């Protein structure tokens, strides 16, 4: 009896991570949400405000991507973010977009909008193949 209980618990431990993955329904919902974000973000402020949501979708999608896709987008995102370190330890969240502090200036607004458009394009390509 004891060995069957142990075997059952072991089987549950092996199966449970498979049940909590990024499902096809989640992927389809995120694909629709990306298209909606890109379509609805008509002005610069809307694009800047939607950047975080694009990053959140990318973070959900991250485990299901190929190594090449992850490295490509990570490199792009890291080029546009700064690590915030206090006493050598990253703050909660670990990174802050460079563009956030620069949004005030009109010249930097173009950089932020360009980041949104490029990130949106890269993530949308992941869904369309």
Curated annotation (Swiss-Prot):
The positions flagged as glycosylation sites are: 49
Location in the cell reads: Secreted
Q: Which InterPro entries match?
A: Turandot
Keywords associated with the record = Antibiotic, Antimicrobial, Glycoprotein, Immunity, Innate immunity, Secreted, Signal
A single Pfam family it belongs to is: Turandot
Signal sequence region: 1-21
GO biological processes: cellular response to heat; defense response to bacterium; innate immune response; response to bacterium; response to cold; response to heat; response to mechanical stimulus; response to oxidative stress
Q: What is its main location?
A: secreted
GO CC annotation: what is one?
Answer: extracellular space
Q: What does this protein do?
A: A humoral factor that plays a role in stress tolerance; gives increased resistance to the lethal effects of bacterial challenge and stress. Regulated by the JAK/STAT pathway and NF-KB-like Relish pathway in the fat body, upd3 in the hemocytes and Mekk1 in response to septic injury and consequent immune response.
Task: State the similarity comment.
Answer: Belongs to the Turandot family.
Q: What is this protein called?
A: Protein Turandot A2
